[in-house]
Regions:
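Catalytic domains that recognize anionic headgroups
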Residues: 1-315
């Protein structure tokens, strides 16, 4: 059974019998009313999407949000990158001649524009956890993920009203349709979508058309499991499996995946209510042979660190 299917089965265990004792959940304080005018915020994370792939795709709908920027991720792998995002550290601009502490402060202040109220990051101490803070000021929170390393049993699933590992790793549409927005309080959502993660397959592509490359110790090993965590592949090991044409094809698949997500993104723009701020970015990039690297993770290379970033208020 593929890795994703095994994890999904384990995480979707049958419900206990009706007479089974229930575990008492810790009491949460009553959720207050949100600040007046507080905005909904939706963060879309295109897993493994390179900045240049995004630019080559020329996304029509995502680009409506604002200027497409090249930014830099704080981490080269999915789990730590999402942790950074959830403490409020979105991909950075790599500014020169600026103290890091000053940049953090300026970057956090951007949340006042995104959320449309006077955000107090002093209130995030000591938890340093954006979903928890937003719940404490009246938000509903949700996160839908494609990657098994972010499954609901992991520590990332904290302070969310709705958190789910989706049935398919490469389809943002069910995430969009699962989101709920309310008149009485704003919502915060994170959507981790995997169309742009290897094998860069869109939902309309038959699985037997996906690329199959076996026998390599690294990111493209275990492709029957499809979505194992990325590992570096040394150029000597990969030489027999990857030539320039093959790598170009793999990169082109990611560009095509961005275009597919962009078409689906039109539905997201139609779904969210007025006063919603949407951010689109990636958790990390991907190497397609540059510098002798393949994949992401334990790789120090610009193409793994460069990510797209675009955001803005909808209507």
């Amino acid at each position: 059974m593929p890795l994703l299917a095994r994890l999904a089965a384990a995480l979707r265990a049958p419900a206990p019998p009706a007479d089974a004792p229930t575990r008492e959940e810790p009491r949460r304080p009553a959720r207050p009313n949100a600040p007046d005018g507080a905005a909904n915020h939706v963060v879309v994370v295109l897993d493994s999407c390179r900045f240049d792939s995004f630019v080559r795709a020329k996304p029509r709908f995502m680009s409506r949000l604002g200027e497409v920027q090249r930014r830099w991720t704080y981490a080269t792998w999915t789990a730590p990158s999402h942790y950074n995002l959830l403490i409020g550290l979105l991909p950075h601009e790599s500014p020169r001649n600026v103290y890091a502490s000053d940049y953090y402060k300026q970057d956090f202040l951007r949340f006042k524009e995104r959320l449309n109220f006077d955000v107090s990051f002093a209130d995030m101490v000591p938890n340093l956890w954006l979903p928890g803070y937003l719940r404490s000021v009246g938000y509903r929170t949700g996160m839908y993920v494609s990657m098994p390393v972010l499954n609901p049993a992991t520590p990332i699933n904290r302070d969310f009203d709705d958190y789910a590992l989706m049935d398919r790793h490469n389809d943002i549409v069910p995430m969009i349709r699962r989101m709920r927005f309310y008149e009485e309080r704003p919502s915060f959502y994170v959507l981790n979508t995997g169309e742009t993660h290897y094998p860069d397959a869109t939902p309309d592509e038959p699985e037997n058309h996906w690329p199959r490359i076996s026998g390599v110790n690294g990111v493209f090993k275990h492709l029957d499991d499809h979505l194992r965590a990325g590992r570096a592949v040394h150029a000597r090991e990969a030489e027999a499996f990857f030539d320039g044409e093959r790598l170009a094809q793999l990169h082109a698949r990611q560009v095509n995946a961005v275009q597919w997500v962009d078409r689906a993104f039109e539905e997201l723009l139609d779904t969210v209510p007025p006063n919603t701020w949407v951010t689109v970015t990636a958790d990390h990039g991907e190497c397609f042979g540059e510098g002798g690297y393949f994949g992401h993770g334990p790789i120090q290379h610009d193409k793994v660190l460069e990510v797209p970033f675009v955001e803005g208020r909808v209507r």
